[in-house]
């Protein structure tokens, strides 16, 4: 998609919004990383205070995808840190959405990748690898399914059942 704001996407796709094919996440996320505008096909992960499964995905080639992580909204520890974000950047991921906390904010802000998270927290998560992958999530009042498309900029985050060409 050429540079078109999420607001313009919403304006041009009112019927998709009414039908639920295009959905906006509630505005609860902080913006991190150098890439403030990003989009791509969604890969979903559901974890709780454990980042082993997240790290596993970010070790793979991203091919412009967006990893969407439902961390249960936990504010007790960070499930994403600087090292995996650097790896994600190097492996070609477009962005990472975290329904939870991150840490190593200065390092992440230096990376050419888009990251959204609820907050930062200095305590790290466990690395047991527990969680679910490629499942439907409900984050910030919005259903997000593996394989859908995500569009993010400084106005907000949209999820679409199909790739949009605006």
From Swiss-Prot:
It comes from the Eukaryota. Substrate binds at residues 81-84, 103. Divalent metal cation. The keyword Metal-binding applies. GO terms for cellular component: cytosol. InterPro entries: RraA, RraA/RraA-like, RraA/RraA-like_sf. It catalyses: 4-hydroxy-4-methyl-2-oxoglutarate = 2 pyruvate; oxaloacetate + H(+) = pyruvate + CO2. Keywords: Acetylation, Lyase, Metal-binding. GO terms for molecular function: 4-hydroxy-4-methyl-2-oxoglutarate aldolase activity; metal ion binding; oxaloacetate decarboxylase activity; ribonuclease inhibitor activity. It is an enzyme of class 4 (lyase). SUPFAM superfamilies: RraA-like (SSF89562). A divalent metal cation binds at residue 104. Its cofactor is a divalent metal cation. One of its GO terms (biological process) is regulation of RNA metabolic process. Homotrimer. Catalyzes the aldol cleavage of 4-hydroxy-4-methyl-2-oxoglutarate (HMG) into 2 molecules of pyruvate. Also contains a secondary oxaloacetate (OAA) decarboxylase activity due to the common pyruvate enolate transition state formed following C-C bond cleavage in the retro-aldol and decarboxylation reactions. NCBIfam families: NOT-MenG, PRK09372.1. This is Putative 4-hydroxy-4-methyl-2-oxoglutarate aldolase 1.
